[in-house]
Swiss-Prot record:
CDD domains assigned: UBA_EF-Ts
GO terms assigned for molecular function: translation elongation factor activity
Protein name: Elongation factor Ts
Involved in Mg(2+) ion dislocation from EF-Tu, as annotated region: 82-85
Record keyword Ion transport present: no
SUPFAM superfamilies assigned: Elongation factor Ts (EF-Ts), dimerisation domain (SSF54713), UBA-like (SSF46934)
Compartment annotation: Cytoplasm
Statement: the UniProt record of this protein carries the keyword Cytoplasm: yes
HAMAP family linked: EF_Ts
NCBIfam families given in the database record: tsf
GO cellular component: a single term: cytoplasm
Length: 285
């Protein structure tokens, strides 16, 4: 039997919204394979949908900067340990220096960016007594570039064609709010589509309908699925009567690419109380 850790149970609970006992049981049955556990829970109706792995648990800021000619832009995530330090003047100044260098020197590799600022980072850590990390760097080049920051925790950069700055800004704001994973439905990887198709087919077959009818039911569900995770298929947050794709079509524009960063995505802090709770629960198995 695979080792079912407290962290694994917690992640499954967060991604499915199911109860602790259901998550523990699903992981045991799936021998610790969290993705298989999610699929099985969805098929059985215990989980309607699964959130992406990882949760926001760190502090820090997202910064964006676009060159004066508007053709090159960078976005970075700079982490610290507490919200207090995230608002510190020295921390902010360090972030400004980092992103300015990334832009002006066209640095595209985060490890190279880290190496360039390691001495300054170490000095700042010693001064404020908190760990600091240049975690991520994203670059977009070409087209009409635009960015949007929602506070300091969510940042978006967009590259578009045939769009003005206002349209790009509105699309960036939509991305910040709606978290699309791909630009178009056709961009969704085949393995992601195949996995969801199998889940939906299994659910449809449970109704007792013939396979050909179940397949037709799944076709509609799959269109909805790919539409919900792709930018152009989502309903525009500022005018839900149309999709982002329809909005772009009205302006003769298209989105080339986008980057969305949120502080702490995928970083998890240990929570001892929850571990103790799961350990006690584990005695029932």
């Amino acid at each position: 039997m695979a080792d079912i850790t407290a962290a694994l149970v917690k992640e499954l609970r967060e991604r499915t919204g199911a109860g602790m006992m259901e998550c523990k049981k699903a992981l045991v049955e799936a021998q610790g394979d969290i993705e298989l556990a999610i699929d099985n829970m969805r098929k059985s109706g215990q989980a309607k949908a699964a959130k992406k792995a990882g949760r926001v648990a760190a502090e820090g800021v997202i910064l964006t900067k676009i060159a004066q000619d508007g053709k090159y832009g960078v976005i970075i995530e700079l982490n610290c340990e507490t919200d207090f330090v995230a608002k510190d003047g020295g921390f902010k100044a360090f972030g400004d220096e980092v992103i300015t260098a990334a832009l002006n020197e066209r640095i595209t590799d985060v490890e190279a960016l880290k190496a360039k600022f390691e001495e300054q980072r170490t000095a700042l850590v010693a001064k404020i007594s908190e760990n600091i990390n240049i975690r991520r760097l994203g670059v977009l080049e070409g087209g009409v570039l635009g960015s949007y920051l929602h506070g300091a925790r969510i940042g978006v950069m967009v590259s578009a064609a045939g769009a003005d700055e206002e349209l790009v800004k509105h699309v960036a704001m939509h991305i910040a709010a709606s978290k699309p994973e791909y630009v178009n439905a056709d961009d969704v990887p085949a393995d992601v589509v195949a996995r969801e198709h199998q889940i939906q087919l299994d659910i449809a077959m449970q109704s007792g309908k013939p396979r050909e009818i179940a397949e037709k039911m799944v076709e509609g569900r799959m269109r909805k699925f790919t539409g919900e995770i792709s930018l152009t298929g989502q309903h525009f947050v500022m005018d839900p009567s149309k999709t982002v794709g329809q909005l772009l079509g009205e302006h003769g524009a298209k989105i080339n690419n986008f980057i969305r960063f949120e502080v702490g995505e995928g970083i998890e802090k240990a929570e001892v109380d929850f571990a103790a709770e799961v350990a006690a629960m584990g005695k029932q198995f």
